[in-house]
Amino acid sequence: GHIEQIGYSLYLKMLEDELNALSKNEVDQKENKLDLKLNVNAFLNSELISEDRLRLELYRRLSKCEQVYEVYEIEGEIEDRFGKLDIYTKQFLSLITIKILALNKFKSISNYEQNIQFTALNDEKELIKAKSKDDDDILEAILTHLRKA
């Protein structure tokens, strides 16, 4: 109930901040914090993973991922336990992958419709355009760009 009231992205941010504070990584994280301002629907869908406790545990584990392969391992685990992933869960896993790939390279990534702006650590800005303003096209364009960077 609480998560639906505050929204998944805010909840995730609060959870991530708490986990960082608990693990004393706060100083390191603040230096290279990535600000993702993407207008996409992405969350671990309660229709796929109905048990709150399991979903929260997956959010926690995903927030701790530092390498892309860790996200892929958890993705495989979710598929094994709950079946084929829905679009929102796939997009959430893409967001986690984007955070990992962009960390220590970019300050922020944002979008307005299909226009995507990357702001590097040196404040240099770069604009790219996704095929469309669909969430999956935006995420695909960002991932493709980050893998080239």
Where are these regions (language model features)?
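Accessory helical-bundle/CTD segments and flexible terminal tails appended to RecA-like ATPase motors
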Residues: 1-149
